[in-house]
Amino acid sequence: MSGRHNNKLPTNLPQLQNLIKRDPKSYTEEFLQQYRHYQSNVEIFKHQPDKANKDLSELVMFLAQVGHCYLEELSDFPQQLTDLLLNYHTVLESDLRMTFCKALIMLRNKDLVSPTSLLGLFFELLRCHDKLLRKTLYTHIVTDIKNINAKHKNNKMNTTLQNFMYTMLRDSNPIAAKISLDVMVELYRRNIWNDAKTVNVITTACFSKVTKILVAGLKFFLGKDEDEKKDDDSESEDEGSTARDLMMRYSTGKKTSKNKKKLEKAMKVLKKHKKKKKVEVFNFSAIHLIHDPQDFSEKLLKQLESSNERFEVKIMMMELISRLVGIHELFLFNFYPFVQRFLQPHQREVTKILLCAAQSSHQLVPPEIIEPVIMTIANNFVTDRNSGEVMTVGINAIKEVVARCPLSMSEDLLQDLTQYKSHKDKNVVMSARGLIQLFRDLNPKMLTRKDRGRPTESSKEAKIHKYGELEAKDYIPGAEVLEAEKAEDEEDEDGWESASMSDDDEDGEWVNVHHSSDDDQAEVAEKLQSIPEEERKAKAAMVSTSRLLTQDDFKKIRVAQMAKEVGNAPGKGQKRKNVDSDEEERGELLSLRDIERLHKKPKSDKETRLATAMAGRTDRKEFTKKRGKLNPYASTSNKEKKRKKNFMMMRHSQNVRTKGKRSFREKQIALRDSLLKKRKFK
């Protein structure tokens, strides 16, 4: 057994490596022998660095594996590998170069090499024309920095590494600069380097002359944080209880269609207020970390105006500028005439340009700056000579612009656009109704009387503020309900109200049974609607200044404010239906769905339908019955062989010669039947 090849340690490095890891001291001599062998191979390699050297490759990996066992003997080993790579990385054979890098990565994972020295070497190696090597180094850099900050953020090390990354971003080699940018973006997305310093360095990539670096920087700011998801399940118990109380209150009366409609409207208002109450989450926090967004957007616009990049890159720059202007509410008046030039129905990617126009609008922009943009959209898109889809997109874009800058809409243009509510195209009709619904909330007085819908207490209070006007209130709106509730409690000590099946019941109303304080609050709010507005403001101011409000008080105020949106205004009955809109809550950013929303899917032409049908037939099997085998890889059965065998080989077979044939009588009957059948069909 002693003569077996795998027990010869000098030539069997894996076995020696295994034994050394178990007992390093016992195999020191064998290790030193291999180390001397490695040094001699290095000398040979220096004379022919471009040749493949399998022995050197195996020895390097062996020493990297056992490096932690002999720290003194291998103290110069990492530096020696680093020098070899720095001096010969351009002429090294690709596999040997990869082996050297993997050995250094292994030593770094064992904390035998400092990250700063290794980072400088690896960024130097990124200049090599070796895609696999670049991918390996990129993965290691990201993973290594992640591991450094695994337990806690190592600010001292991060500062050193960040400064090195920032210098590499300005490197003359585009490959090294691009990978340094990719590393910073990846580390930001992993919440490792998510500080303002990193974000502001990435902004410099948006002015790079290298298109790939420019696009990577733009994509970073146009992305979205993955963690910011709308999760309706994360609502608080208070909000859930309010909805349950609302359901209980409206279900205690008769089950009439009138009660059902009131319940649906109340639930819509409740959902709307919940979304308003939620803590604001930013769609992408990187845009908020930019130190000087005004200067950044001005430089981007200047670069865009003189840019010779592809149209797709220009669109990305326009999107980023519009987001900066909209989110930070910047003054960039030259951007609107620039966008206005592209607002034509035949323009390529016109919906994205309309999105930019809407996103860059906000309430601090003077109305006379936005008004030409709206008129251009109306004149070029919302005309009868265009198709229904084009008109729909135009009205949707105008609606989104006006929602952010209401003063830019003139009353005459609004009257013209609302006339499309009776258009023959369903999509145009729904878009016009959406615009009407928007102005019912913003300023109903701008609509014609028949378009204002059923007035509510909330719509009576709605008005558009003048440009630059701020509404500073010295009271909490809705606080008067607390004073009214106090007076009600004094009158009715027991807190119960008699529920009688009287006129209200016959009229189809529900019975007011008190299940919680929310019901009391809603009824008190309904009574307060008959009080003059000035008196209510005075009561609210008195309550706001004379007592400390608790969480329960704020909840009562919130319920009362919601009741204003559900109930009719005093003396007003229901004359016509409200326009139901399926609008989503407007967030910080717009999406293309808001511009391209079509309520009715357009008909496909014949070519599109045929292509869809043919695409669905690719994986379909033939309409023939195939006797499948239990095992598809099994051999052919004897029955199948007999069926497929050549007849000339089978004619002298006993089975063929003794085969039973039809008798003369059977042939007569078959002939008679066939003749009768032919006669029958004549």
Swiss-Prot record:
Indicate, by first and last residue, each region the UniProt record lists as having compositional bias (Acidic residues). 228-240, 486-509
Region spans: Disordered? 226-248, 485-545, 564-587, 601-682
Q: Which GO terms describe its biological process?
A: protein transport; ribosomal large subunit biogenesis; ribosomal large subunit export from nucleus
Pfam short name (any one): SDA1_C
Q: Name one GO cellular component term.
A: nucleolus
For this UniProt record, the keywords arranged alphabetically read as follows:
Coiled coil, Nucleus, Protein transport, Ribosome biogenesis, Transport
- SUPFAM superfamilies annotated for this entry? ARM repeat (SSF48371)
Q: Which domain of life is it from?
A: Eukaryota
Q: Which residues form a coiled coil?
A: 254-319
- Where is this gene product found? Nucleus, Nucleolus
Renumbered to this chain, the Basic and acidic residues biased-composition regions fall at 663-676
Family, per entry: Belongs to the SDA1 family.
Question: Per its database record, what is this protein's job?
Answer: Required for 60S pre-ribosomal subunits export to the cytoplasm.
What is the official name of this protein in its record? Protein SDA1 homolog
